[in-house]
Amino acid sequence: MSDLLSRRLALLGAAANLPLLTECLHGIERECLRVDSDGKLALTPHPRALGSTLTHPQITTDYSEALLEFITPTETDVADTLGDLERIHRFASSKLDGEYLWSPSMPCELPDEESIPIARYGSSMIGRLKYVYRKGLALRYGKTMQCIAGIHYNFSLPERLWPLLRQAEGSELSERDYQSAAYIALIRNFRRYSWLLMYLFGASPALDAGFLRGRPSQLERLDEHTLYLPYATSLRMSDLGYQNNAQAGLTPCYNDLQSYIDSLRQAVSTPYPPYEKVGTKQDGEWVQLNTNILQIENEYYSSIRPKRVTYTGERPVQALAARGVQYVEVRCLDINPFLPLGIDLDEARFLDAFLLFCAFSDSPLLNGECSDATDNFLAVVKEGRRPGLQLQRRGQPVELQVWANELLERIADTAALLDRARGGEAHAAALAAQRAKVADAELTPSAQVLKVMRERGESFEAFSLRQSREHAEYFRQHPLAAEEQARFEKMASDSLAEQTELERDQDGDFDTFVAAYQASILGLISN
């Protein structure tokens, strides 16, 4: 164990401080496509019974009208977070009228690009802005890529913990700057070690052959309708996904918060010639919010983001600049198609131990390690289960299995501390489940997906639809209690009323609204 990690764990293990570790906050966002009874993309509007996608706090859409997003409230106990997520699923599932929630991350058979419906948010200024932003995404990246779903895991350490560490380490940074620097250090370590999450939890080794739209690839054919790679863990996170020339040169620096803010601010204010050629309007209709490298900060695709809860009308980078980092959003997790919620307690508890390990371990600046971190990540998503696969560690080759076992040995100390804080051995058990996967790659979700498809002679689509139906049956057999159902019904109707009020009360024109929104980022100049 590194000196810094052992010192921090000893400090937090003291009787007076141990309860702090029960105050970490968790939130989960789960995306999933709506599909019809045959497993094809649902072309129906967002069910009104689920409420307004603009104003509902827990049920919205991501890119497409058919791409649902479920958002839990924050909880200190991740078991409660998963309970929240299950209740959202139960309610939504009861309102789908013969449609299903698609079980994996990679999409079902999709119609042609033109027919994939972009999410609608009504006629308010902000609703129209969200729609135009998505039109811009279609223009820049194509609609097909935007139909990939994932799980986002939001995690924060208790605010009371940072002053304790800052004082113990004699830092001269302000409390806010110390906290931000610590989260950025967590992100640097996440970049170093996130390949491990791809090995353990990647669950997208195969996809529907039509997804590539005829483009050449290195993928192999499993059957007439399915492409795959034999040792892949997460094709979702491979370079099949969100690769784009405009973003290729955009590598936000994780050396400190200000440089990260500056790089994103530059990207949302720097024109990109191919986008300039298209312009923001065609035949008087908006087609993208601007012609810059990024329309808004959230367009930047990354496996983890520093975050701060925003005020109404505030942009993410403004919130970070004004008040510092509050939590991290892990964005690289596949949906496990065997699980009704796409994630379970073992995975969540391991993520907590992993993120605490990243937060408390020594985290030097990445500098030359950046390319190694990217190469390791891409190697694991494409061939993570290949026997003897070698990664790069500080410029030297190391076998994945050797490095994974060493990391799990170190993460065991944070898992043990979490168990001491909460009582029981749940985190140790979650860690043991991951050790078993490192010892035997056949236990990983990606291997299990291919195993079941081969054993049953199923295409990707047939496997996924069967799992989707099984999950729907699970939710049907576990309906919400009447009181909970009524609470969700009220949340839906309240959100519809709120959207109606927004649309009634607005004035001004959309062009002026967009101009003001664009201008809001330009004041964030580094001091």
Curated annotation (Swiss-Prot):
This enzyme's EC code(s): 6.3.2.2
Pfam families registered for this protein in UniProt: Glu_cys_ligase
Keyword Ligase: yes
A GO term for molecular function: ATP binding
Gene Ontology biological process terms, A to Z: glutathione biosynthetic process
Catalytic activity line of the entry: L-cysteine + L-glutamate + ATP = gamma-L-glutamyl-L-cysteine + ADP + phosphate + H(+)
Any one GO CC term of the record: cytosol
Annotated pathway: Sulfur metabolism; glutathione biosynthesis; glutathione from L-cysteine and L-glutamate: step 1/2
ATP-binding listed as a keyword: yes
Keywords tagged on the record: ATP-binding, Glutathione biosynthesis, Ligase, Nucleotide-binding
InterPro entries: Gln_synth/guanido_kin_cat_dom, Glu_cys_ligase, Glut_cys_ligase
Transmembrane segments: none
Family: Belongs to the glutamate--cysteine ligase type 1 family. Type 1 subfamily.
Protein name: Glutamate--cysteine ligase
UniProt source species: Pseudomonas aeruginosa (strain ATCC 15692 / DSM 22644 / CIP 104116 / JCM 14847 / LMG 12228 / 1C / PRS 101 / PAO1)
Organism taxonomic ancestry: Bacteria, Pseudomonadati, Pseudomonadota, Gammaproteobacteria, Pseudomonadales
